[in-house]
Amino acid sequence: EMTSSLVGSEMCIRDSRKTGALLVISMIPTALLGLTGKRLALLAADSQIVPGIGFLLTGVFLLVTDLNKSGGKKGPREASYDSAMWIGICQGIAVFPGISRMGFTLCAALLCGYNRKFAVRFSVFMSLPAIIGAFFTEIGNFGASEMTAGLGFTYVFAMIIAGFAGCLVIRNTIAMTQNIKLRYFASVSYTHLRAHETRRH
């Protein structure tokens, strides 16, 4: 019994290390796309057409993944670093308006053969380094004269609060998305698309 417990603990540690390595690999394309596409994404945000296209693509991706019954049996040990790169690319694309980061990364993970539980967890935890990286990127945009002690404290305090709030909702998010069909999330994207089209006209 003690031997099996030790083996289980060792496997858990290995899974955690592999997951961490996969997350680091996924951040490479995310960071590159985020930095190079930031200006284009800001221009796209002012467009009346691009956000609608983003909602449409998100809905189609979710629906196709759901109808195709995508997903496999891969956990951290079976997941490849190539798949992490592809999922990271999908997260980088989500810098554009209308593209759901959670939707794109979850679908990509399922299409790469990840099991549903690991796909959801990986998608959720991928957001944390991306958010932190975006925070420090925005901080770097301020000049020394613009960055006061008060403003710096506000940013740090906001990040801490967001971190606590994120930790509280992560568990519920994982539990909810593990069981719900992706087509329901697709319908939400189409609802946003209709609302966007209504505002345009």
How does the language model describe each region?
Residues D46-V50, F142-V156:
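Juxtamembrane helix-entry segments on the extracytoplasmic side of multipass membrane proteins
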Residues G88-P97, A130:
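Transmembrane alpha-helix interface/packing and boundary motifs in multi-pass membrane proteins
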Residues C90, G103-M126:
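Interfacial segments of multi-pass membrane proteins
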